[in-house]
């Protein structure tokens, strides 16, 4: 709050980056490890759309840290905008968008406005097309409307297919106790220049790549 109100966006962003770095280090105390794998060249400049499966709230800190130079912003449910120290404030004021899925027309308009902002500022939009997190880690069906809206509003984007494994294990007991020695992995499965892809075919590719990379129980 101090950084945002008194020092502006850049200071706020750096404080969020380092907050999430230290959240990861705190989990290291429990033997939790985070491995990020990316064999692809991601442009240093230009907007991104990061498409990922969703297993727990512990997906968020490594995405923020490992993609920090791209300014990741999230599409999140509105209930997370209150009640979580630091996290809720960042969702409200850090450039992300909060939506109520029950109000679909308004939600899509908010995603449209969010996409325009990402395109203009050359940020990274992070979307979990499953809608809700998978409590057992197994992939759910991808919903297309939100992602297709981002495709329309961020035509210059590089699209990142990101697969997350094992973060669900950190939340399997309702976040307490947190199991010891969990190995969480984030792997970029592929990248696509949006302008070179047909949107529906790209959506199908992304779902196949990401869901296919999730470890089976």
Model regions: which residues?
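A cross-taxonomic marker for long C-terminal extensions/tails that follow the last structured domain
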Residues: 196-217
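Short acidic-hydrophobic, aromatic-tinged amphipathic segments that line or gate anion-handling sites
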Residues: 36, 97-100, 194
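Catalytic core of membrane glycerolipid acyltransferases/transacylases, capturing the structured
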Residues: 2-9, 13-16, 44-103
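A cross-family acyltransferase "interaction/gating" segment
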Residues: 85-88, 124-126, 132-200
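Hydrophobic alpha-helical segments of integral membrane proteins
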Residues: 15-26, 30, 90, 146
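Short coil/turn segments at beta-strand junctions that form active-site/ligand-binding loops
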Residues: 45-47, 70, 121-123, 157-158
